Amino acid sequence: MAAWGRRRLGPGGGSSRERVSLSATDCYIVHEIYSGENAQDQFEYELEQALEAQYKYIVIEPTRIGDETARWITVGNCLHKTAVLAGTACLFTPLALPLDYSHYISLPAGVLSLACCTLYGISWQFDPCCKYQVEYDAYKLSRLPLHTLTSSTPVVLVRKDDLHRKRLHNTIALAALVYCVKKVYELYAV
């Protein structure tokens, strides 16, 4: 499998322009080398193996799989942010609006927060890709050995701890659920 374009970068694997030396477990490059009919499947397999190996940086040269991965991460980020913002709106709307009208905004916002949190939990929570973010910072990208690539527009993923992020949106969504159940009970049972 090493002959299929996989390269690990370790000390001395980059150039003298690097400001930080990377160990062999820091960076993995999915090279765009077409060696048969199933090259796209091989790229996906290499990416999956790199994600499961938990490399700090993953550089994806193949444009199609890089764009798909970046979109997948963007959708997950959107679900997370929507869950947090809608849950926050659900919880703080009763403080800002009169009580007679606040439930018209807070209940739909709470349901939206719960829906996004549930969808994130089902589709993204156990995906190894959710531990990564797409890196756009030019300074951080300059520290990586991108000069060895054949692609001019690689997608660079950086591994980040998402434990606090998941706790935040789960806590806010749970609080929104409690508020919504309480409010529905007050509106219809009393």
Swiss-Prot record:
The gene is Tmem11. Its main location: mitochondrion. InterPro entries: TMEM11. It is found in: Mitochondrion inner membrane. The keyword Transmembrane helix applies. One of its GO terms (cellular component) is mitochondrial inner membrane. The chain crosses the membrane at residues 84-100, 107-124. It is a multi-pass membrane protein. This is Transmembrane protein 11, mitochondrial. Belongs to the TMEM11 family. One of its GO terms (biological process) is inner mitochondrial membrane organization. Associates with the mitochondrial contact site and cristae organizing system (MICOS) complex, composed of at least MICOS10/MIC10, CHCHD3/MIC19, CHCHD6/MIC25, APOOL/MIC27, IMMT/MIC60, APOO/MIC23/MIC26 and QIL1/MIC13. This complex was also known under the names MINOS or MitOS complex. The MICOS complex associates with mitochondrial outer membrane proteins SAMM50, MTX1, MTX2 and DNAJC11, mitochondrial inner membrane protein TMEM11 and with HSPA9. Interacts with IMMT/MIC60. The keyword Ubl conjugation does not apply. Keywords: Membrane, Mitochondrion, Mitochondrion inner membrane, Transmembrane, Transmembrane helix. Plays a role in mitochondrial morphogenesis.
